[in-house]
């Protein structure tokens, strides 16, 4: 059962078997059928006109999303906060890296990048569907994290404190800064 992308509902799956590249495409289609998701078969020409990619692999899904906020989640455990990340591929990479370390919650704080961007989804290699991810402004995020007694750990290479000296408790938020500007002042001021 998927948890991620907040509250996402799969509605339709569009397929073009002429474009399939993997061996598990029919298994995936069967899983959608079991969940009573509508399967729409398309010609190669029509599929290519709908796809975001230059060389699509024959499967395209349509989602209806619901905007969620930090209050919509029962936060516990480590949280990755992506502060003003600009490039969708970088956000997707952070998602899959966070999952490798068992993070279940990711906040895109003051997000420049749309968390539903196809490049975010693709570069997360599917892990976006196994996490809670949402966008929120930094001030609200700091406020909620403090109310929940979270340690705020800024990954700042110019910090006087070393990450090596930190002994995490159960609830901590790891802050990763933007590609160009690093960590915002609000996160530096509120770091543990």
Walk through the language-model features, giving the residues of each.
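Structural motif
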Residues: 15-23
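RNA substrate-binding interface of SAM-dependent RNA methyltransferases
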Residues: 12-16, 40, 71-159
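Glycine/small-residue-rich loop that forms an oxyanion/phosphate-binding "nest" at active or ligand-binding sites
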Residues: 32, 36-59
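Active-site/ligand-binding-proximal alpha/beta "capping" segment
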Residues: 154-192
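Short, aromatic/basic amphipathic alpha-helical patches
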Residues: 23-35, 187
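Single conserved hydrophobic/aromatic residue that forms the stacking wall/gate
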Residues: 1-9
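Acidic/glycine-rich phosphate/pyrophosphate-binding loops and surrounding catalytic core
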Residues: 54, 59-75
């Amino acid at each position: 059962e998927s948890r991620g992308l907040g509250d996402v509902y799969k509605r339709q799956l569009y397929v073009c078997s002429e474009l399939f590249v993997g061996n598990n495409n029919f298994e995936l289609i069967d899983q959608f059928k079991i969940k009573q998701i509508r399967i729409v078969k398309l010609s190669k020409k029509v599929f290519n006109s709908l796809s975001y990619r230059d060389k699509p692999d024959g499967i395209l899904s349509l989602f209806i999303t619901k905007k969620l906020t930090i209050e919509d989640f029962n936060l516990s455990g480590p949280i990755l906060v992506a502060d003003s990340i600009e490039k969708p591929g970088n956000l997707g990479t952070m998602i899959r890296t966070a999952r490798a370390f068992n993070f279940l919650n990711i906040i895109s704080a003051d997000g420049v990048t749309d968390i539903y961007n196809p490049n975010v989804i693709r570069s997360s290699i599917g892990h976006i569907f196994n996490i809670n991810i949402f966008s929120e402004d930094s001030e609200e995020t700091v406020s909620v994290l403090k109310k929940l007694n979270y340690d705020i750990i800024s990954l700042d290479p110019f910090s006087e404190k070393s990450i090596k000296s930190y002994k995490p408790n159960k609830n901590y938020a790891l802050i990763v800064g933007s590609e160009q500007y690093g960590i915002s002042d609000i996160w530096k001021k509120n770091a543990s």
